[in-house]
């Protein structure tokens, strides 16, 4: 395909074609569909560098055509009108169907990931803490929503976190072509928007999982509750909660979860084995 080498059997190639056909329904013309297929193959295929220029170079048997293919990819990613969220949703449903053939999707997992950078021009980059590096570093941060079975997980939605240093800088916004309607949103805000989209789309899942960066947020926990979602979230021992009765009414004064755990005693807890 496209002059690029792939280690793929016939069944794999058929699945790949089925995936491209599903995504093709979201794209308006043959040129967009061809550009999407070329870019996706470049990301999935061999070669360490995954930007447009090396993808174009690997795809072209004739070096004279490389500039044309490179420009085609740039136009598709930067200027060509297509709904990236719709593409992501169709891709997610396609992949979830494949996961469910092996075992059911049980959980949603929210997390953020840092992408280390050298310069200052990548959209959203600044010195900020990232758990990926375990320190403050020059990086972009993306918030992701993944679905998970007992043995596999798959990211289905993603939002780039834009710090105020980008949102409040008109020159940076113009250069990066950040849409005028994009306002500052915290990582919690981004995570909740993805959850709301997943609920609206009917994505399967039983329990929302996240670490304390999200679990410490009352807004996050309360929004999940209002959406009717069960959750298991990381929180810190000093975090205070209210005990409630069967009717949901608060009882007494708030208590830290650390003290509550001590009062419950060891018999109230059990270990849940992790599946490798």
Label every PLM stretch briefly:
Residues 1-27:
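Basic, low-complexity segments
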Residues 27-35, 133-138:
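Structural motif
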Residues 31-32, 43, 47-120, 220, ...:
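Electropositive nucleic-acid engagement tracts
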Residues 34-38, 126-127:
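Short linear interaction motifs
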Residues 37-46, 144:
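Short, hydrophobic/amphipathic alpha-helical patches that form generic packing surfaces
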Residues 38, 140-143, 189-196:
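Short, contiguous clusters of charged residues that form electrostatic/catalytic patches at enzyme active sites
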Residues 75-164, 169, 174:
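Active-site-proximal, Lys/Arg-enriched surface segment
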Residues 171-276:
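An internal, acidic/charged active-site-proximal segment
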């Amino acid at each position: 395909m496209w002059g690029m080498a792939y280690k793929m059997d016939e069944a794999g190639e058929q699945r790949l074609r089925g995936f491209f056909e599903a995504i093709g329904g979201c794209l308006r013309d043959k040129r967009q569909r061809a550009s999407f297929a070329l870019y996706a193959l470049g990301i999935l295929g061999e070669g360490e560098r995954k930007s447009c220029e090396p993808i174009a170079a690997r795809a072209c048997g004739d070096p004279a055509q490389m500039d044309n293919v490179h420009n085609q990819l740039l136009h598709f990613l930067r200027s060509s009108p297509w709904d990236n969220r719709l593409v992501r949703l169709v891709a997610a449903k396609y992949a979830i169907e494949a996961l469910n053939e092996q075992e059911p999707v049980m959980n949603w997992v929210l997390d953020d990931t840092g992408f280390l950078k050298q310069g200052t021009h990548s959209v959203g980059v600044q010195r900020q803490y990232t758990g990926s590096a375990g320190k403050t570093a020059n990086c972009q941060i993306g918030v992701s929503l993944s679905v998970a079975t007992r043995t596999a997980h798959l990211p289905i939605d993603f939002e780039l976190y834009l710090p105020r240093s980008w949102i409040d800088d008109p020159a940076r916004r113009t250069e990066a072509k950040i849409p005028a309607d994009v306002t500052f949103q915290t990582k919690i805000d981004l995570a909740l928007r993805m959850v709301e989209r997943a609920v609206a789309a009917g994505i399967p899942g039983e329990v929302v999982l996240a670490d304390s960066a999200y679990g410490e947020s009352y807004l996050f926990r309360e929004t999940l509750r209002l959406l009717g979602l069960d959750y298991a979230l990381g929180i810190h021992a000093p975090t205070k909660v209210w005990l409630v009765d069967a009717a949901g009414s608060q009882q007494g004064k708030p208590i830290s979860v650390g003290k509550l755990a001590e009062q419950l005693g060891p018999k109230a807890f059990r270990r849940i084995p992790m599946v490798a």
